[in-house]
Swiss-Prot record:
Encoding gene, per UniProt annotation: prfB
Family classification: Belongs to the prokaryotic/mitochondrial release factor family.
Main location: cytoplasm
Description of post-translational modifications: Methylated by PrmC. Methylation increases the termination efficiency of RF2.
Any single Gene Ontology cellular-component annotation: cytoplasm
Cellular localization per UniProt: Cytoplasm
Transmembrane segments: none
Name under which the protein is recorded: Peptide chain release factor 2
Organism encoding this protein: Mycobacterium marinum (strain ATCC BAA-535 / M)
InterPro entries membership: PCRF (IPR005139), Pep_chain_release_fac_I (IPR000352), Pep_chain_release_fac_I_sf (IPR045853), PrfB (IPR004374)
Organism placement in taxonomy: Bacteria, Bacillati, Actinomycetota, Actinomycetes, Mycobacteriales
Length: 371
């Protein structure tokens, strides 16, 4: 093996050792043991919400441990591949060396991707995520675009086996959605998805235009951490107005014969939250209250950041606006305007393959915070 490659493998070993230390591999094993004990409790499923969270965290933690252990195994096998290549002769030697080099490059990329997880150290990064998507300028195309974005995030969650809980969907008259709110139940979902917050722009030939003209549409993505009891977001009963109405589906059609949908208005701030996806009024009220608490927590965080920016003389950040462009016509490209990361196959991105964008966004945010 060439000395340069030996040095590069040593650098990979150092990087992976850092990842193992930051992720606390022994701590992961202990956490898995505890979660497996909880999951084996026959009474766990008496509380569906808790059961879902326990099984989701168990699956995520097991996957995280497997990923790190597999990286360590591959790194230990890598020098062996180069030794075997050195023993070959002629064309076989070239093929074996190419195979070893390919594994080296793949392993380096996988370790770099795992390093991203160690950058999620913000106060709320470990939380589950509450995502709201709203259609913007662009009429029916914008409503359709908002629904496409929702599908993209749901598909991403499904590919990672993260449960998704839809709280509310407000359908547009002709097609698509006006807005939707859903939770992604997975550890670090907030820290990961928070880089998606901002305006997403779509350029395509409109399927709703009988002249097949090009249309630019916008949708806004908001990502909040799910509130926990330790956040102490107490809402006096008199501060909330509760309105009930019938759930509606696409085109405004009623999907329920009772007034099960709930609208909460926080009187002091004017924040309005709706929930209509649960079967009962009580369930919708509980879900809507969770969303309202998350929005009030975010409002508190924004106020605290504004005070800090004022002390620092910082004008604040507007990076969330126009954060990504999805062009389907006249060429095909998805490009993040903050990180410059881009992919030439929008179809795969819209089908949930967004890990590259998430990793680039997390690294960008980390560099920005260090400045």
């Amino acid at each position: 093996m060439e000395p340069d490659r030996q040095a590069e493998i040593a650098a990979l070993d150092s990087a992976l050792t850092t990842v193992e230390r930051v992720l606390d591999v022994e701590g992961l094993r202990s956490r898995i043991e505890k979660l497996e004990h909880e999951a084996s409790d026959p009474k766990l499923w008496d509380d569906q919400t808790r059961a879902q969270r326990v099984t989701s965290e168990l699956s995520h933690t097991q996957g995280e441990l497997r990923r790190v252990e597999e990286l360590r195994r591959r790194l230990e096998d890598l020098p062996v591949l180069y030794e075997l290549a050195a023993e070959e002769e002629g064309a076989a030697a070239g093929e074996a060396l190419a195979e070893a080099d390919a594994e080296f490059k793949a392993l380096r990329a996988d370790i770099e991707a795992t390093e991203v997880r160690t950058l999620l150290s913000g106060e709320y990064d470990e939380r589950e995520a509450l995502v709201t998507i709203r259609s913007g300028a662009g009429g029916v195309d914008a409503a359709d675009w908002a629904e496409m974005l929702m599908r993209m995030y749901v598909r991403w969650a499904e590919q990672h086996k993260y449960p998704v809980e839809v709280f509310d969907t407000s359908y547009a008259e002709e097609a698509g959605i006006k807005s939707a709110t859903f939770a992604v139940h997975a550890p670090f979902a907030y820290g990961t998805l928070s880089v998606e917050q901002g305006t997403h722009r779509l350029v395509r030939i409109s399927p709703f235009d009988n002249q097949s003209r090009r249309q630019t549409s916008f949708a806004e993505v908001e990502v909040l951490p799910v509130v926990e009891t330790t956040d102490h977001i107490d809402i006096p009963e008199g501060d909330v107005r509760v309105d009930v109405y019938r759930s509606s589906g696409p085109g405004g059609q009623s999907v329920n014969t009772t007034d099960s949908a709930v609208r909460l208005t926080h009187i002091p701030t004017g924040i309005v939250v709706t929930c209509q996806n649960e079967k009962s009024q009580l369930q919708n009220k509980v879900a809507a209250m969770r969303v309202l608490q998350a929005k009030l927590l975010e409002r508190k965080r924004i106020e605290e950041r504004a005070e800090l920016d004022a002390l620092k003389g910082d004008g604040g950040s507007s990076w969330g606006n126009q954060m990504r462009s999805y062009v389907l016509h006249p060429y095909q490209m998805v490009k993040d305007l903050r990180t410059e990361y881009e992919v030439g196959n929008p179809a795969t991105v819209l089908d949930g393959d967004i890990d590259g964008f998430l990793e680039a966004g997390i690294r960008w945010r980390n560099r920005k915070d260090d400045d």
